[in-house]
């Protein structure tokens, strides 16, 4: 970054913001880079500001029982805040005084008062000086208040982050990431931009009092008619606002529901294509969109009327103020024009400035209270350690994760026991509470000496991780004692990678020791991986390790723990993502050799690890099931494998036990405090099973291992499904969390490809921070996108006499939408994370505008209609101008107002009714035309938004995976959430505002030019200057906003990264270092934001200066060239003030339109994506010259003779696959053949290309070569026909929000009887029947109430229903317990006995049924043979098998005597799905 010119700028340069000219000039000429941004002043650095506020907050905590954060803020910022407030008040006073001078200038043209004509020139100078003074006061005041707001935000940002690092784990378990992000974005943004409005809470009342006094001198008591109208208008708009909120709350549910399905579609786009569900998903989303648009239109119409009411109130407030006085006493022109100017200022103060100020204070104080409560939460307390201790001892330790744990569930039980099903039975969700009040650890005892290895094992939820947390001090024991030295190193069960190099991640702030570093690298099997990078271990890893696989991240995390020289090493399931061979080598070389002299506690379920451990501790439901050696375990607990590792069959449990299991599963997702609801209602509600979890902790069942991102939406009211929605008295609440998840090779936050080895965004319930910390981070990280842009407040339509501050206020209202409820109005996704999915030009191109306008055939006609209506309004206004300009020549004998002022009288006794009728007629005309002229435009623009959404959705679903691989999941979801919300809400009214303002300016210029042609000559260069200035500023401002967005992303990225690795940070004591990194991220964002504020102020001030110059010219031209007639001067000066303020706002509005049209540009980019290819060969060459019915069975009535494929034979020739066109080959020259009905297993190490081969079979990649199925080539049929030949069980199971039946048969081709039959075949029937509504039970959050095994059975049922002849299985047993695995094996034998099966597996025993095996190494086929031949040859396959005890199963593979598995073969490896369900 460069040094800021502000440091050496003069006072004049600072006053006029001239120091920003270099960056403006550079941005206009070329693309700005981060290096072009100026350094921030030292006073704005996060270090200084946070230290200042932290000092005052500590002082507040120490001095009072009830500390107030606002007091600390007051001591830091109050005096500067008040100084700029006084400047702002003085600027507003000048605005109130201007009408007085205008009235005196008009009075000087009174024919009977020629003595004052000579002072008109001086009055004009005074009026112009007022404008100059106001400009010099207003802009520094606004900038200063912005600056203070920015400093307050930075200081509180830092304070919140520091507090986050200190929070206890119990507190972290009660709050969600969404709440933290909201605290840092939504709440603090209120200070950043809203502070400029805060002073109007006292300025506006003073201004109203001053104006009322001045108008009283003109109109006396009739002024209260105008004031009363403004008050009624404010109440009317408040009523419209409530109506708009009602529609908005209803619409929020529909938006959430659509985005739920959309995000699930994006997350699982590869599965959607594999299942050929494009049409079903498109229809489902479009149906939801239709319902949403109905409410969108209603809300838009209400906002439009609200906007129109304010715009046209200016005419009526003058009309009602003047008319009573005029009818009684008559009135002169001077009073009319003076009153018009006064009423404009009065209207803004009453209906805008004061309500906005009150709202700002309300929101700000609410935000301060929330932050204050957060800062007072319980902090993490380190345990007292004995540094001389060499042993680790735990005596009679009992612990709870939450105090009052039992009370929480007692309350839930009491609340939900009142629920009854429709037939009177107890609600299934809460029929059993066996786990209420259970401690996470109970009476734990063990002792290990220095250098010993303790292996901790146990079933899911046994408390293994909690045991390590208690040793680390993260969990405080309620009973018992813990004794160890305190020098701890820790490796989490989910690898955590911080942004930086591999070396920095391993060393992690510890002093560098070359020999130790190399030894650790070698022991953790990282040498080969590091050698592949050009930068070796200095390669910079993205957030979460974007360039690494899951196994590499796991080994780096282990290396970090091993590198630190500690007395005690806590290793929490470090081998979960390693293949058998790598795991074996690392365990031997690292855990057993390199760390042989260290005390180690290893959480594992591997039998090999238990055998080599000095001591074994097996936990069961938080209690110690066994403690001793392995030989003692075999003698004392021979049944430990079946009892603790889940080997019992669910179907063999008693009915009470089955009910308890299901109850516990469902209980975790039940809605606390819901009103009673019947199951018949439940099946009509798509989200009844989830909801707001309140502030109390609920146990978590997290989603599967391969989720990359989770899109969390929690809604207090049930969302609509099938057009039915339950009424609720509570407002809808929308919360979105940033809950990082993971997938191989993927990055944290937005920098993730849509498809790599997993999906992108998954809808799920809100998670606590603790759950996020204990969630998988090995697979890519999740970003929870906030989707509330569509619910923001939309500003009211501008009026003709806005000041720059008024314009800013309206811009603030439009952009930020300050709402009382943070949950409803959490900032949009892009407010927190930069969406850099593609490069959009800094300024929207004309082609985008043209394409947008021509998208709907009616839009052009609607624009012409608006122009015609405007001309009619101009004609009506000319009637008033004619009246004002000509009534001064009435016969003075008709005057009763003044005997000597005949030319000044316009209202007389004889003409009063005539004039009254004219005013009423004009008012009615303006009211009718103004209220309804924009409705067709708003309606049509929403229709255009509907068309764009439909085209974009269709384009995404039909786009090839090679294109989607180049996109980021966050970018896709942003198009459907943020950009569609802009198209629905902001763009229609913003375009209407701009068109309206533009026409007003044109009309006013035309009128003034007719009255005084010389003024037209002054107008032309001014308009040209505005246009040039806009073009000059727009290039730089848009780039600065992009850089600011890019600078915002690291702040929230760092927050999420820190929280995910918080236990590691504390174990290593790296909190100060991460605070420094956070301050750097804040300073980077501050540099961009401060420069944007400065350049914006430069632009606004230059507009104001041009306006002042123009007004000076108009004033003196009108004074010097106008002869008799005060009416002409009054019209010219009044309209001149209106022209420039309106033109000023029109320029700003055009900038807003350009900014919003960038959303249209991004949508067009998606619409223009290529579509998947069509057949390139004729189908007539097959089967005797004719391919009979190239189709898959899609209903049960198709004759077998007409079915393709009929046998399932596959021939693969020279298959080469790439993720993207022109990229590196990920499969090369693959050739082999599969006989009909044969079962083929794919073998190879992680990353060898097994899953990629299955994707290539489905034509999901860029492929070359040829594949034939039963003689039909893949380029001879459509993609839909080809993919329907396969049944698929993917690695990432796709369960979308909908009923069981919809998930099994989305096209609704099969009857309930047929679905039940298939469910019975695959073992799903007993599961589905446990749920209320059975097939109509609505699954949400990716099927969160189902185990991963049940989800796999769902996929198996889909394949059975498809009647596919070829079945592709990608790691189907990766997360299965033995029981579910046996169900799948049985179903495969029965339902797919005559089908071709291709199986990709890591577990050797899962592939015993395969006849042939394809070994893939380095993206090529190395071997393709039977299992016996592979074992007899030297190969990687034989090497891996030799290291597994399961090899003894192979001799029995074909033996009829083999009936059962050995009782103790292996402890089941705890998979991520199970870990996610762990109740710590």
Swiss-Prot record:
The gene is CFTR. It catalyses: ATP + H2O + closed Cl(-) channel = ADP + phosphate + open Cl(-) channel; chloride(in) = chloride(out); hydrogencarbonate(in) = hydrogencarbonate(out); ATP + H2O = ADP + phosphate + H(+). The modification Phosphothreonine is found at residue 717. Residues 654-831 are annotated as: Disordered R region. There is a cross-link at residue 688 (Glycyl lysine isopeptide (Lys-Gly) (interchain with G-Cter in ubiquitin)). Residues 1-77, 147-195, 244-298, 359-858, 940-990, 1035-1095, 1152-1480 are cytoplasmic. Belongs to the ABC transporter superfamily. ABCC family. CFTR transporter (TC 3.A.1.202) subfamily. Its EC number is 5.6.1.6. InterPro entries: AAA+_ATPase, ABC1_TM_dom, ABC1_TM_sf, ABC_transporter-like_ATP-bd, ABC_transporter-like_CS, ABC_transporter_C-like, CFTR/ABCC7, CFTR1_ATP-bd_dom1. It comes from Plecturocebus moloch. N-glycosylated. Phosphorylated; cAMP treatment promotes phosphorylation and activates the channel. Dephosphorylation decreases the ATPase activity (in vitro). Phosphorylation at PKA sites activates the channel. Phosphorylation at PKC sites enhances the response to phosphorylation by PKA. Phosphorylated by AMPK; this inhibits channel activity. PROSITE patterns: ABC_TM1F, ABC_TRANSPORTER_1, ABC_TRANSPORTER_2. This is Cystic fibrosis transmembrane conductance regulator. One of its GO terms (cellular component) is apical plasma membrane. Residues 1470-1480 have a biased composition (Acidic residues). Residues 1386-1480 are annotated as: Interaction with GORASP2.
């Amino acid at each position: 970054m460069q040094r800021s010119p502000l440091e050496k700028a003069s006072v004049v340069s600072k006053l006029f913001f001239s120091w920003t000219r270099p960056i403006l000039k550079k941005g206009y000429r070329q693309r700005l880079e981060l290096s072009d941004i100026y350094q921030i002043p030292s006073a704005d650095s996060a270090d200084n500001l946070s230290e200042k506020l932290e000092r005052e907050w500590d002082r507040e905590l120490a001095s009072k029982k009830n500390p107030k954060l606002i007091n600390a803020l007051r001591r830091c910022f109050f005096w500067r805040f008040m100084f700029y407030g006084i400047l702002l008040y003085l600027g507003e006073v000048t605005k109130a005084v201007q009408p007085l001078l205008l009235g005196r200038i008009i009075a000087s043209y009174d024919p009977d008062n020629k003595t004052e004509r000579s002072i008109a020139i001086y009055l004009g100078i005074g009026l112009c000086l007022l404008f100059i003074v106001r400009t010099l006061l207003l802009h520094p005041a606004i900038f200063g208040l912005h600056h203070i707001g920015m400093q307050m935000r930075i200081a509180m940002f830092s304070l919140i982050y520091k507090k986050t690092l200190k929070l206890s784990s119990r507190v972290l378990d009660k709050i969600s990431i969404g709440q933290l992000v909201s605290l840092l974005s939504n709440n603090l943004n209120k200070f950043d931009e809203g502070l400029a409005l805060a002073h109007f809470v006292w300025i506006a009342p003073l201004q109203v009092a001053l104006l009322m006094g001045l108008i009283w001198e003109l109109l006396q008591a009739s002024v209260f008619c105008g004031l009363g109208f403004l008050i009624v208008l404010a109440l009317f708009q408040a009523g419209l606002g409530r109506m708009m909120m009602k529609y908005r709350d209803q619409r929020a549910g529909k938006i959430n529901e659509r985005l739920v399905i959309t995000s699930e579609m994006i997350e699982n786009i590869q599965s959607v294509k594999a299942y050929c569900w494009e049409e079903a998903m498109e229809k489902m989303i479009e149906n939801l969109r239709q319902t949403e648009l109905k409410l969108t239109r209603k809300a838009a119409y209400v906002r439009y009327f609200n906007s129109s009411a304010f715009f046209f109130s200016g005419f009526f407030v003058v009309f009602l103020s003047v008319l009573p006085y005029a009818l009684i006493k008559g009135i002169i022109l001077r009073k009319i024009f003076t009153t018009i100017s006064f009423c404009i200022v009065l209207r803004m103060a009453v209906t805008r400035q004061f309500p906005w100020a009150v709202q700002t204070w309300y929101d700000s104080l609410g935000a301060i209270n929330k932050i204050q409560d957060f800062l007072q939460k319980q902090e993490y307390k380190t345990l007292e350690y004995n540094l001389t201790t060499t042993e680790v001892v735990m005596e009679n330790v009992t612990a709870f994760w939450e105090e009052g744990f039992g009370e929480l569930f007692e309350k839930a039980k009491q609340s939900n026991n009142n629920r009854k099903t429709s037939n009177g039975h107890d609600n299934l969700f809460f029929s059993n509470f066996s786990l209420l009040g259970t401690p996470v650890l109970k009476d734990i005892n063990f002792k290990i000496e220095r250098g010993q290895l303790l292996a901790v094992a146990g079933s899911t939820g046994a408390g293994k991780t909690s045991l390590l947390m208690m040793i680390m001090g993260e969990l405080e024991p309620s009973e018992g004692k813990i004794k160890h030295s305190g020098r701890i190193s820790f490796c989490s069960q989910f690898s955590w990678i911080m942004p930086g190099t591999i070396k920095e991640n391993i060393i992690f702030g510890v002093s560098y020791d070359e020999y130790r570093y190399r030894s650790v690298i070698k022991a953790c099997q990282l040498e080969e991986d590091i050698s592949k990078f050009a930068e070796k271990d200095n390669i910079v890893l993205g957030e979460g390790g974007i360039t690494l696989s899951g196994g590499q991240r796991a080994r780096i995390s282990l290396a970090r723990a091993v590198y630190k020289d500690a007395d005690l090493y806590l290793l929490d399931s470090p081998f979960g993502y390693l293949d058998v061979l790598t795991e074996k080598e690392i365990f031997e070389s690292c855990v057993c050799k390199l760390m042989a002299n260290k005390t180690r506690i290893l959480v594992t379920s591997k039998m090999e690890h238990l055998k080599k451990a000095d001591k074994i501790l097996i936990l069961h439901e938080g209690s110690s099931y066994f403690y001793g050696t392995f030989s003692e375990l075999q003698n004392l607990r021979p049944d430990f494998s079946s009892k603790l590792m889940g080997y019992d069959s669910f179907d063999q449990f008693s009915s009470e036990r089955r009910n308890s299991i299901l109850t516990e599963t469902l209980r975790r997702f039940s809605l606390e405090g819901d009103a009673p609801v019947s199951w018949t209602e439940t099946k009509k509600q798509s989200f009844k099973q989830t909801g707001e979890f309140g502030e109390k902790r609920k146990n978590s069942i997290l989603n599967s291992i391969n989720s990359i991102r989770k899109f969390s939406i929690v809604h207090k009211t049930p969302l609509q499904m099938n057009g039915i929605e339950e009424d609720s008295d509570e407002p809808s609440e929308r919360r979105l969390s940033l809950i990082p998840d993971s997938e191989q090779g993927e990055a944290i936050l937005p920098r993730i490809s849509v498809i790599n080895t997993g999906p992108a965004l998954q809808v799920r319930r809100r998670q606590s921070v603790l759950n996020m910390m204990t969630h998988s981070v090995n697979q890519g990280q999740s970003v929870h996108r906030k989707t509330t842009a569509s619910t923001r407040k939309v500003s009211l339509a501008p009026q003709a006499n806005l000041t720059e501050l008024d314009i800013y206020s309206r811009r603030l209202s439009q952009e930020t939408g300050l709402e009382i409820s943070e949950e409803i109005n959490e900032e949009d996704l892009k407010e927190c994370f930069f969406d850099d999915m593609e490069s959009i030009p800094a300024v929207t191109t004309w082609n985008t505008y043209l394409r947008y306008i021509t998208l709907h055939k009616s839009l052009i006609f609607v624009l012409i209609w608006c122009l015609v209506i405007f001309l009619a309004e101009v004609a009506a206004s000319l009637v008033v101008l004619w009246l004002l300009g000509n009534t001064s020549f009435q016969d003075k004998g008709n005057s009763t107002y003044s005997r000597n002022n005949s030319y000044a009288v316009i209202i007389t006794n004889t003409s009063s009714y005539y004039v009254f009728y004219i005013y009423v007629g004009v008012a009615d005309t303006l009211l009718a035309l103004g209220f309804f002229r924009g409705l067709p435009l708003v309606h049509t623009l929403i229709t255009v938004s509907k068309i764009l959404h439909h085209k974009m959705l269709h384009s995404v679903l039909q786009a090839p995976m090679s294109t989607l691989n180049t996109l980021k999941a966050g970018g896709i979801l942003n198009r459907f959430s943020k950009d569609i919300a802009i198209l629905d809400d902001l763009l229609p009214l913003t375009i209407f505002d701009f068109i309206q303002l533009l026409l007003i300016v044109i009309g006013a210029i035309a009128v003034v030019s007719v009255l005084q042609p010389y003024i037209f000559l002054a107008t032309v260069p001014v308009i040209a200057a505005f246009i040039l200035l806009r073009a000059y500023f727009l290039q730089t401002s848009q780039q600065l906003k992009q850089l600011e967005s890019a600078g915002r992303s690291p702040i929230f990225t760092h927050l999420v990264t820190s929280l995910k690795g918080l236990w590691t940070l504390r174990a290593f004591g790296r909190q100060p270092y991460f605070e420094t990194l956070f301050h750097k991220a804040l300073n980077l964002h501050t540099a961009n934001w401060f420069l944007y504020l400065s350049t914006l102020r430069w632009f606004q001030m230059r507009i104001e200066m041009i306006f002042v110059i123009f007004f000076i010219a108009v004033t003196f031209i009108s004074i010097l060239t106008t002869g008799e007639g005060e009416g002409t001067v009054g019209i010219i000066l009044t309209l001149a003030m209106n022209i420039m303020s309106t033109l000023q706002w029109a320029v700003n509005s055009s900038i807003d339109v350009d900014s919003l049209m960038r959303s249209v540009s991004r949508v067009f980019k998606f619409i223009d994506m290529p579509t998947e290819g069509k057949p390139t060969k004729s189908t007539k060459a097959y089967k005797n010259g004719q391919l009979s019915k190239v189709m898959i069975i899609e209903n049960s009535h198709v004759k077998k003779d007409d079915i393709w494929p009929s046998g399932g034979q596959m021939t693969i020739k020279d298959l080469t696959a790439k993720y993207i066109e022109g990229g590196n080959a990920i499969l090369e020259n693959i050739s082999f053949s599969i006989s009909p009905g044969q079962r083929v297993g794919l073998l190879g190490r992680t990353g060898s290309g097994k899953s990629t081969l299955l994707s290539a079979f489905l034509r999901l990649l860029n492929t070359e070569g040829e594949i034939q199925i039963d003689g039909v080539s893949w380029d001879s049929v459509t993609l839909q026909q080809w993919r329907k030949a396969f049944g698929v069980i993917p690695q990432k199971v796709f369960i979308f929000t909908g009923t069981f039946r919809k998930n099994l048969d989305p096209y609704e081709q099969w009857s309930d009887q047929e679905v039940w039959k298939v469910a019975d075949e695959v073992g799903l029937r007993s599961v589905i029947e446990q749920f209320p509504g059975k097939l109509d039970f609505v699954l949400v959050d990716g099927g969160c109430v189902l185990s991963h095994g049940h989800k796999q059975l769902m996929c198996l049922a889909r394949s059975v229903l498809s009647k596919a002849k070829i079945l592709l299985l990608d790691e189907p047993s990766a997360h299965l317990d033995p029981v579910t695995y046996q169900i799948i094996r049985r179903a495969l034998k029965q339902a797919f006995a005559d089908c071709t099966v291709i199986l990709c597996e890591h577990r050797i025993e899962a592939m015993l049924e395969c006849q042939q095996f394809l070994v893939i190494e380095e993206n090529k086929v190395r071997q393709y043979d039977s299992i016996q031949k592979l074992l007899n040859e030297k190969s990687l396959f034989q090497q891996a098998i030799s290291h597994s005890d399961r090899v003894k199963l192979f001799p029995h593979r074909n033996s009829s005597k083999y009936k059962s598995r050995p009782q103790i073969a292996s402890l089941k490896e705890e998979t991520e799905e199970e870990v996610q369900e762990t109740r710590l």
